[in-house]
Amino acid sequence: YGKKKKVSDMGKFKELIEEHPMCAGCAMTLFIRLVFLALPKPEHTVMVGTAGCGRLAISQGNVPFVYGNYGDTNAVASGLKRGLELRFPEQEKDVVVMCGDGGLVDIGFQGLMHSWFRHEKFTTIMLDNEIYGNTGGQESGMTEKGLVAKMSPRGKVDDKMDMLGLAKVAN
């Protein structure tokens, strides 16, 4: 830990995640490996995740993982970060939320926005695949307008949510 790594080192980078039960060629495992590779202090980091197949790979990593209910990842991270600050006042502990767009923006919107309003000191990473991929292909708030999916055969009617704009307003 603590050694500088580049993306070109990923083929040799196996300390944090190696084996996983994901489908062969799944982009989620690459995404998770990149996040783990970028952690400044993985030995002092706790990951928070929720429903979705990404939790299968995250939980196989050498980083503590908390599995929250669907949509409550930022609420869990808020309490976890505060608890870690009380328990380890001399050691900074990082909390990182890693979640898909459905769990974070649609179902977890309230917790996400309130963590921004309170200026909570943890990182939230959203994997925006623009659809509920695990449950059959329903549109999400992050789906582009007009996209035709299995569960929205006429195409999405509404615009994609402007999460960057909401984040700017919240801060």
What do the PLM-derived regions correspond to, one by one?
Residues 9-69:
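Active-site diphosphate/adenylate-binding microenvironment
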Residues 18-24, 99-102, 147-156:
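Flexible, glycine/proline-enriched loop segments at strand-loop-helix junctions
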Residues 133-138:
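Glycine-rich, charge-decorated loop segments at or immediately adjacent to ligand/cofactor-binding or catalytic sites
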Residues 55-132:
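Thiamine diphosphate
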Residues 37, 114, 166:
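Hydrophobic/aromatic ligand-binding patch that stacks against planar heteroaromatic rings
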Residues 9, 140-171:
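Conserved thiamine diphosphate
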